[in-house]
């Protein structure tokens, strides 16, 4: 099964009333080990390199976000500053000049959306939540 259509759906969910999208990249990884569900070949894929996926998955699986707090979150080769965590399922991060990340887990996956610099992270939060909650509703 290809999960790439979920990237398109997430990005579409971030559009505001004027039709402007507020997420430019996204991906889905497994919560067990951080293996990618979406392909890096998608035009809007957020590409996780090396240990980035496993490091993110380890924090969500254990619900221990201390590594994010002390060292930031690295995704697509960029280190983002941890902003906050909510309910052990949602993490927000930002890097000046690079945009922001929204990460939300379901039972078996972590959905990650990127808001470009100048984009509204709140809209990206909404898009990520739609996909994560849909997966959760399927027991995933």
From Swiss-Prot:
It is found in: Cytoplasm, Cytoskeleton. GO terms for biological process: regulation of cellular component organization. GO terms for molecular function: actin monomer binding. The modification N-acetylserine is found at residue 2. CDD domains: PROF. The keyword Zinc does not apply. Keywords: Acetylation, Actin-binding, Cytoplasm, Cytoskeleton. GO terms for cellular component: cell cortex; cytoskeleton. It comes from the Eukaryota. PROSITE patterns: PROFILIN. Its main location: cytoplasm. InterPro entries: PFN, PFN_euk, PFN_sf, Profilin_CS. Binds to actin and affects the structure of the cytoskeleton. At high concentrations, profilin prevents the polymerization of actin, whereas it enhances it at low concentrations. By binding to PIP2, it inhibits the formation of IP3 and DG. Occurs in many kinds of cells as a complex with monomeric actin in a 1:1 ratio. Belongs to the profilin family. This is Profilin. It comes from Heliocidaris crassispina (Sea urchin). The lineage of its organism: Eukaryota, Metazoa, Echinodermata, Eleutherozoa, Echinozoa.
